[in-house]
């Protein structure tokens, strides 16, 4: 088979892989090949042009969460004078899925056009795997023994194959779905269990809760003590209260031991505690794993660390001409991070000024109902890195919810600082529009803003965000790792 020659071969057409390919082809006039298994979203492989984010991640999920929020908006509108016949209201799940599918397909098509219209950029449909450090095979399937469709020779290889939902090895796992399949359910489940305490489980619990039938019940189980491990503890506690107030059943310290299929098609879940419950749908959302299995990395000697491709701060692997970005590296599994890593890598490889991605102070969100916005360190981490940490905390009922009837919807804002110089180390928000607010806050943290910069800024009134400009007095401190309400002057 005759080989095709490229300057760069990218395995994976996700956000990071496409950014790298586009930049290399347009900014540096390189000949670039991109390999992926599917061009448009949906089964059997789910991920297609645009990767997880576009097809079975951020984009469709945000659309579905937006749809789910209308349930509460309609209920709350009565407090503002709106009257309507509630008996005629019904949620059309099929329409939600249809418009979601159309939106995702439009993005898929835009990437198809990019390949068609960009000189030097070529797409190959199939499974990419390494034959050597300079040769990538495009195969018919994931099976390393499957037929080779194309043989690509290249000076540089970029691994951008992303991640995949992790499914636990328990009896009956074949009766469960992952988040991939959840985007294509023909109808909303009546009794659903989302397994896991991370953002995917929490977000889908909110979606299912809004669209469930009237006699439906959403249950979330998590093996730990509180959902959203690694996030600010105050936000975790308050979100748990609000999810419960919205009717979601949260079971902590519970983990499925086995799943059995009942005669009526429902699933019987036996938990490790011995508890047994029946559900119509069980969705596993216990994390994602770097997608390295089918890459045949051993053929080029590429090393793995903690399940992901091992890279340095410039996204270089241990093999001089092979690089990796995004989820497959198991660093920060966020789309904007992968895009930034891609742009930096292409400049490093083909440009004259090597640069790297700063993985600190990355703003992110959980699109739960209500949502979370977060950037920087949580107090438990900050207190171990800095001698004295000051924590500013505020919680309140937003103006609209004094009228909407949802007074339980507390907005929480927390600012964490290095007390010695006032530098803001972290900001954590829970409540309406928190993800939108945190983006601007992220810029502040990148500029090393101090708490005085926050409270010397005039806020926009009336908004929840203005609370960030009003917090002048610490609520409590950490001194050498110990939490204190009012430490002595000497200790500060």
UniProtKB/Swiss-Prot annotation:
Localized where?
Cytoplasm
Q: Which cofactor does it need?
A: FAD
Q: What is the effect of changing residue 353 to T?
A: In strain: Silvio
Broad EC category:
oxidoreductase
Reaction equations catalysed: trypanothione + NADP(+) = trypanothione disulfide + NADPH + H(+)
Swapping residue 156 to H leads to an effect described as: In strain: Silvio
The protein's matches in PANTHER family, at most eight in alphabetical order, are given as: GLUTATHIONE REDUCTASE
More about this protein: The active site is a redox-active disulfide bond.
Q: State the protein's purpose.
A: Trypanothione is the parasite analog of glutathione; this enzyme is the equivalent of glutathione reductase.
The family note in this entry says: Belongs to the class-I pyridine nucleotide-disulfide oxidoreductase family.
Q: How does it assemble?
A: Homodimer.
Its protein name is: Trypanothione reductase
Source species of the chain: Trypanosoma cruzi
């Amino acid at each position: 088979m005759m080989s095709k020659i490229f300057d760069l071969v990218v395995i994976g057409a996700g956000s990071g892989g496409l950014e790298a390919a586009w930049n290399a082809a347009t900014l540096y006039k390189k000949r670039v090949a991109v390999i992926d298994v599917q061009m448009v979203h949906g089964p059997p492989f789910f991920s297609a042009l645009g990767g997880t984010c576009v097809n079975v991640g951020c984009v469709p999920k945000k659309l579905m969460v937006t749809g789910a929020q209308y349930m509460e908006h309609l209920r709350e509108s009565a407090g503002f004078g709106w009257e309507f016949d509630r008996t005629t209201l019904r949620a059309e799940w099929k329409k939600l899925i249809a418009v979601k599918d159309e939106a995702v397909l439009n993005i898929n098509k835009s990437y198809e056009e990019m390949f068609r219209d960009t000189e030097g950029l070529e797409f190959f449909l199939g499974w990419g795997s390494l034959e050597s450090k300079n040769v990538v095979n495009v195969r018919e399937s994931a099976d390393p023994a499957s037929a080779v469709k194309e043989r690509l020779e290249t000076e540089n290889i970029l691994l951008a194959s992303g991640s995949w939902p992790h499914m636990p090895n328990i009896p009956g796992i074949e009766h469960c779905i992952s988040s991939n399949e959840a985007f294509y359910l023909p109808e909303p489940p009546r009794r659903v269990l989302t397994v896991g305490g991370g953002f995917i489980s929490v977000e889908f619990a909110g979606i299912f809760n809004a669209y469930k039938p009237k006699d439906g019940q959403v249950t979330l189980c998590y093996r730990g003590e509180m959902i959203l491990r690694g996030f600010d503890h105050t936000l975790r506690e308050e979100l748990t209260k609000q999810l419960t107030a919205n009717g979601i059943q949260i079971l902590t310290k519970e983990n499925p031991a086995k799943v059995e299929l009942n005669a009526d098609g429902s699933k019987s879940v036996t938990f490790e505690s011995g508890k047994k419950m029946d559900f119509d749908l069980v969705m596993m959302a216990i994390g994602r794993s770097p997608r390295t299995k089918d890459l045949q990395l051993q053929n080029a000697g590429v090393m793995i660390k903690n399940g992901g491709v091992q890279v340095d701060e410039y996204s270089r692997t241990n093999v001089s001409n092979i690089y990796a970005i995004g989820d497959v590296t198991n660093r920060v599994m966020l789309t904007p991070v992968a895009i930034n890593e891609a742009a930096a890598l292409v400049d490093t490889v083909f440009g004259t000024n090597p640069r790297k991605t700063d993985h600190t102070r990355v703003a992110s969100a959980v699109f739960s109902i209500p949502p979370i916005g977060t950037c920087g360190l949580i107090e438990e981490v900050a207190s171990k890195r800095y001698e004295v940490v000051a924590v500013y905390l505020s919680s309140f009922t937003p103006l609209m919810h004094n009228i909407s009837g949802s007074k339980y919807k507390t907005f929480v804002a927390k600012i964490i600082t290095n007390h010695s110089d006032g530098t803001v180390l972290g900001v954590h928000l829970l409540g309406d529009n928190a993800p939108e607010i945190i983006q601007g806050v992220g810029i502040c943290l990148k500029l090393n803003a101090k708490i005085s910069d926050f409270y010397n800024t005039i806020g926009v009134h009336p908004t929840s965000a203005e609370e960030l400009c009003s917090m002048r007095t610490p609520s409590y401190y950490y001194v050498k790792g110990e939490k204190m309400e009012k430490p002595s002057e000497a200790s500060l």
